[in-house]
């Protein structure tokens, strides 16, 4: 059976200061089709916890403690939304949160691999995010990097990144005006 990692960014999951529910429904519909009709194992790496938290509490997202607070508020809101949407297709979801140290620890990475295999064997869709509440710096960049790690560690056949960026840039186009595709 083929294994696919899909990473979705905050910009796709939010619209203004709200969750983009129609986009999320479209994503859930796509994943459900891939899982049920195409018989693929799907792992979802989802950003959006901070954005979802911001829909409830307006804090300055440039302050680390505020960002962590927003993630603490937003992660359960995001998971509840996913759970309700996937439930319409009869699909169970599970949450897995990681920090960079988890990939440096043989014991933790082995435990995560064991859990992942059990989830996928039982047709559960794992939804993965960085554990922003305890992370003091983003995992070597962001959830795009996390998705690459997940693809490698869990031996996925393909990684698909859903984003609002036009393509692969040689540097971050939000920080460098001379970034090239």
Regions of interest found by a model, annotated:
Residues 1-181:
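Nucleotide/pyrophosphate-binding catalytic subdomain
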């Amino acid at each position: 059976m083929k294994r696919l990692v899909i990473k979705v960014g905050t910009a796709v999951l939010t619209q203004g200061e709200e969750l983009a529910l129609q986009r999320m429904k479209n994503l859930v519909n796509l994943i459900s089709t891939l899982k049920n009709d195409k018989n693929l194992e799907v792992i979802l790496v989802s950003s959006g916890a901070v954005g979802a938290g911001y829909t409830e509490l307006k804090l300055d997202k440039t302050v680390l403690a505020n960002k962590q607070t927003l993630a603490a508020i937003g992660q359960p809101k995001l998971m509840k939304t996913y759970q309700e949407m996937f439930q319409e297709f009869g699909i169970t979801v599970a949450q897995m949160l990681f920090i960079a140290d988890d990939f440096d620890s043989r014991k933790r990475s082995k435990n995560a691999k064991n859990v992942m295999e059990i989830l996928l064997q039982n047709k559960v869709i794992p939804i993965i995010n960085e554990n922003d509440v305890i992370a003091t710096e983003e995992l070597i960049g962001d959830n795009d990097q996390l998705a690459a790690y997940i693809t490698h560690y869990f031996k996925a056949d393909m990684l698909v990144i859903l984003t609002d960026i036009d393509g692969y840039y040689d540097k971050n186009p939000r920080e460098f005006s001379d970034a090239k595709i």
